[in-house]
């Protein structure tokens, strides 16, 4: 039976990769493999929203992997994150499927964190919990029995950008900075305690525009058109960010799915940038 499940898992993941290059898994596909011992489903939203969840899923709020200081939202040291993930029963050699309440931004953040930590087989549930419920798949309010595991972290430095690299990117044709905030935030028209505006030279691609009206990731053709219309081409090093880089994660996922090889997330994000008085904003 175990061998049969492994074969089924392999076939499903092959179909996913063949149909769509993104690390996306559909409701139908996840429902076939969710009980496989080599698969773990992870809810990345707030703990309070885990009251109704996919049967068998574990809860790891993305905020549990981040610090509040010195900059809110920065990821914790690698060893701390690995310990938290392991205590939730997540091992880096499993197929990890992340999801959230439906917005995609928390799942996207968790996706990026896991990829940065070196987990190779990470998928995001297309449409998240909203799609799972619409598909009449099983949910529960009962807690999931967690068996602690070992998460072996192998940080991928190429997925993380720091402020010095962002400074290098400004005015550099080999780079493009992608701000995943709303147009209002980008233009400095949103109510905020932060310095209003954006990092000089950045282009604005609101994270919501990579999703269709149902919260599903757009097709590769649609995404390619969207990114290239903003000058985000695969020959450049792309650095994505938002206010705290939560929303940047799904942009990272979409770009990697298109085959962009040089994609990073500026984890300090606009929050860190604008807090440094010597940094200019537009």
Map each language-model feature to its residues.
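Cytosolic catalytic domains that perform sulfur/thiol-centered chemistry
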Residues: 19-282
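Bacterial N-terminal signal peptides
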Residues: 8-17
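Bacterial N-terminal signal peptides that target proteins for export
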Residues: 1-8
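Intrinsic disorder/low-complexity signature
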Residues: 2, 17-20
């Amino acid at each position: 039976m175990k061998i049969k499940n492994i074969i089924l898992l392999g076939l499903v993941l092959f179909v996913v990769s063949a149909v769509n290059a993104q690390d996306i898994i559909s409701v139908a596909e996840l429902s076939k493999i969710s009980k496989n011992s080599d698969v773990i489903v992870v809810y990345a939203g707030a703990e309070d929203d885990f009251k109704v969840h996919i049967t068998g899923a574990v809860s790891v709020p993305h905020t549990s992997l981040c610090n509040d200081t010195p900059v809110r939202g920065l990821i914790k040291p690698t060893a701390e994150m690995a310990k938290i993930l392991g205590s939730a029963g997540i091992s880096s050699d499993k197929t990890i499927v992340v999801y959230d309440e439906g917005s995609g931004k928390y799942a996207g953040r968790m996706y990026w964190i896991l990829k940065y930590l070196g987990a190779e087989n990470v998928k995001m549930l297309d449409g998240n919990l909203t799609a799972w419920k619409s598909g009449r798949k099983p949910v529960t309010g009962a807690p999931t029995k967690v068996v602690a595991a070992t998460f072996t972290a192998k940080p991928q430095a190429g997925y993380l950008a720091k402020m010095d690299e962002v400074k290098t990117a400004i005015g550099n044709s080999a780079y493009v900075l992608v701000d995943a905030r709303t147009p209002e935030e980008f233009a400095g028209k949103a109510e905020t305690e932060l310095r209003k505006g954006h990092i000089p030279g950045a282009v604005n691609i609101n994270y919501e525009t990579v999703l269709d009206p149902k919260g599903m990731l757009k097709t590769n053709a649609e995404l390619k058109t969207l990114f290239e219309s903003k000058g985000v081409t695969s020959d450049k090093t792309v650095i994505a960010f938002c206010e705290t880089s939560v929303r940047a994660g799904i942009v990272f996922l979409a770009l990697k799915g298109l085959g962009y090889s040089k994609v990073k997330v500026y984890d300090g994000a606009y929050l860190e940038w604008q807090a440094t008085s010597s940094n200019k904003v537009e």
